[in-house]
Amino acid sequence: MSKLLTNTALSTFRSTRFAARQLSRNFGGIASTAQPVNLKAGYGLDYKKGLLQTQQRQIQLSGARNMFIQTQDTPNPESLKFLPGVEVLGKGNTHDFPSGTTAHGSPLAKLLFRVEGVRAVFFGADFITISKEEGAEWSLIKPEVFAVIMDFFASGLPILHESTPNADTEILEDDDETVMMIKELLDTRIRPTVQEDGGDIVFMGYENGIVKLKMQGSCSSCPSSIVTLKNGVQNMLQFYIPEVESVEQVFDAVDKMADSEFERFERNLKALKEKDSAAPAGGGTN
């Protein structure tokens, strides 16, 4: 009887071990089929988020860590907002790079300007806004920008050599009550809304009832930036601060130089097209 029980137990043990081995092989086969997500394979799944188009991609970093990069449309069709899912400059911090010559303080900005078609770069708290040259295709720019962002965040390098918070709305000792109220309203009500669209708004000064502001990021060259200033920012400032008479957009030397170069390029391109269209067609008989 004891011998029979021993044989039965041995048979059960062998069957259990065989089943466990097969199960292990099956799971091993499943695990071996998992492949890292290729950054340049496909564009992910598009879905609607309110009135904005959002695109999400899963990107495989070193080890088991994943980065989810989303793209979001902005009111400016020439600008696109990239959200890497991690902190970029942190809450309350922004940095504008209107041209490649201004990117010397940021390794990431330098790499982004190497992507063909990129005209301007803007860093926000948790997003990166890319503005493209007119005529450039997002379908060609986006994969390269995805690759740059992924590689950079995997490297662990600093985004800025020296990161400093915005100082334009810092309350100073010589600020009067009106200026303090303007800065407070910009920081608490206006700036967060503008940053949602991939840009920023900077306080440049207040004099004789006129508030001077500078638009950055996607808002700097947005066709509706003037409407935003007049119908949005100006109305809100006037509602809370009766001393405000109007709001003006300020352009610095870099903005003017960039606009001048772009206009010169457009003139040359137009002249070249007119010259080509005026040239006689070849292949005629003598």
Curated annotation (Swiss-Prot):
GO terms for biological process: iron-sulfur cluster assembly. Keywords: Iron, Iron-sulfur, Metal-binding, Mitochondrion, Transit peptide. Transmembrane segments: none annotated. GO terms for cellular component: mitochondrion. It is found in: Mitochondrion. It comes from the Eukaryota. Residues 182-250 are annotated as: NifU. Residues 1-66 form a transit peptide. Coiled coil: none annotated. InterPro entries: FSCA_dom_sf, Nfu/NifU_N, Nfu/NifU_N_sf, NIF_FeS_clus_asmbl_NifU_C. One of its GO terms (molecular function) is iron-sulfur cluster binding. [4Fe-4S] cluster binds at residues 219, 222. Pfam families: Nfu_N (PF08712), NifU (PF01106). Belongs to the NifU family. Molecular scaffold for [Fe-S] cluster assembly of mitochondrial iron-sulfur proteins. PANTHER family: IRON-SULFUR CLUSTER SCAFFOLD PROTEIN NFU-RELATED (PTHR11178), NFU1 IRON-SULFUR CLUSTER SCAFFOLD HOMOLOG, MITOCHONDRIAL (PTHR11178:SF1). This is NFU1 iron-sulfur cluster scaffold homolog, mitochondrial. It comes from Drosophila ananassae. The lineage of its organism: Eukaryota, Metazoa, Ecdysozoa, Arthropoda, Hexapoda.
